[in-house]
Amino acid sequence: MTHITLGQAIWASVRPIIKIYLIIGVGFGLCKMNILTVQATRSISDIVLTILLPCLSFNKIVANIEDNDIKDVGIICLTSVILFATGLGFAFIVRSVLPVPKRWRGGILAGGMFPNISDLPIAYLQSMDQGFIFTEAEGEKGVANVIIFLAMFLICVFNLGGFRLIENDFHYKGDDDEENTLTNDDSAQQPTQPIEGNSSSSSNQDILKEPNESTVPNSSQASYISEKNKKEKTELSVPKPTHTAPPAIDDRSSNSSAVVSIDSITHSLRTNHVDAQSVSELNDPTYRTRSQPIAYTTESRTSHVHNNRRNSITGSLRSIDMRELPAEGMSDLIREYSNVDQYGRRRKSSISSQGAPSVLQADGTISPNLTRTSTLQRVKTSNLTRIITSDATVSKKDIETSGSSLPKWLQKFPLTKFFVFFLKNCLRPCSMAVILALIIAFIPWVKALFVTTSNTPKIKQAPDNAPALTFIMDFTSYVGAASVPFGLILLGATLGRLKIGKLYPGFWKSAVVLVFLRQCIMPIFGVLWCDRLVKAGWLNWENDKMLLFVTAITWNLPTMTTLIYFTASYTPEDETEPVQMECTSFFLMLQYPLMVVSLPFLVSYFIKVQMKL
């Protein structure tokens, strides 16, 4: 056994942190330069979830897990349950004793319960398998162990509905049955006079005012607008993503927006009552009526105009041109990930809500090209595809609608929808990869088709004397290698968009205490749990030191960054007080600086004292 000095142990524990934070810093810089926009972040995140991470999971498990490792898999599952329960318990204590906003009482439980078990521990292990502390083979097996931890994390967050802790914090306007029955057609037929709090936002159509319209009686506003529009002969024909304002426009309107938002153009097309001059003025905040469902304060109105201007500009610019704009922030992240409107109803696809040129005709009807959808199109737009190809698009409505295609007598069982929802989430690419890889790894003669080890039987090889299916391992190894770097870059970009707003009085105490418990006290529990596993005879330091090491560091990981995506997905796009996002941002931003000290301290102690190196 190699013996190292304390200085060597400290350096071995600090060096991986340097690499990790350099990669996170790259993501942070790309975010600030607008190279990694929120749209690009989401696209890369979905690529990681659907391709890169499943390939990495399959490759590491098949290559490094044997049939005699079933006991280790069971220990990992048990450890995961204890880890999640401990974090949940600490969060519940903090929530009960210290001030926490009522609108984040579930979010703090999720933040305490679920750690970031994916890119961070894998990157850390891959920096320590150079032979100084662990061999390359031990490092590979450690990565496989982390992936099994990740599988347990996915089961608890998605399959078992852990995301509901976050969703329960959100209470939307008009939750009563009457308002929930409103449709886009209903909102289009609303009278033009402003009615406080009685407008549906799902249609994304704003009621407009002319500059002097505030002086016109409410009863004559409709005729006023109609009479004004009769004087113009110009009508909009085919919708376009952008619309340049006419030359004859005042400075105020010109300064307000260089181009017109897609939402405004869609409104013009569907009503056919707004002329070209009116369209050019839609982004001017003075034309917005007070009938918006959320009242405008000075701050919220400024933010709303800023978002409209950004939406207008980004709709007509190339991605390289967007780098000249200010860096995207938390409001842009909400705009991209938000899946609900103010009434809690799922936001419709931008294709149908914004009226893309290929979808809406000049008369506002749906193009025949969209109605003749192919099988591929139906698959792409199905709820199942949405669930399994993204990380923050599920909600309680997906649970309620699960099993709706089953026979009526089967739907009567209360657990049917939960069972179907559980199975749906098992179809996630990463979950499928782990399940398939474990089946292959536990059947020696099947595993021999992919890799050759001392425990696999001798079977006929390919012409190059390699296993017949080794090309699959080559593919998954090559593609999966990009998963961890991309994951850390996305982590840096996400942290770069977070902003600490006005916090709930006293909440900083709750956040600081919970972060201290998670990253300073819970690692002690992890070390004690490892010691208990050895004393119980389940593991030993000679053969299972990598599993014990992985178990220890998982107790010192920060909260999952998926928390910010889930919170954004349940936040309405035009929310003026995103309390949940502000609390989540503050809570996450406290943890990553502390990890620079806490994780190397834990690793140094574990190497010198527990492993006795």
Swiss-Prot record:
One of its GO terms (cellular component) is cytoplasm. One of its GO terms (biological process) is transmembrane transport. It is found in: Endoplasmic reticulum membrane. The chain crosses the membrane at residues 10-30, 74-94, 106-126, 143-163, 432-452, 471-491, 546-566, 587-607. The modification Phosphoserine is found at S291, S338. Residues 187-206, 213-226 have a biased composition (Polar residues). Keywords: Cell wall biogenesis/degradation, Endoplasmic reticulum, Membrane, Phosphoprotein, Transmembrane, Transmembrane helix. Residues 177-256, 345-366 are annotated as: Disordered. It is a multi-pass membrane protein. Pfam families: Mem_trans. May be involved in cell wall organization and biogenesis. This is Protein ECM3. It comes from Saccharomyces cerevisiae (strain ATCC 204508 / S288c) (Baker's yeast). The lineage of its organism: Eukaryota, Fungi, Dikarya, Ascomycota, Saccharomycotina.
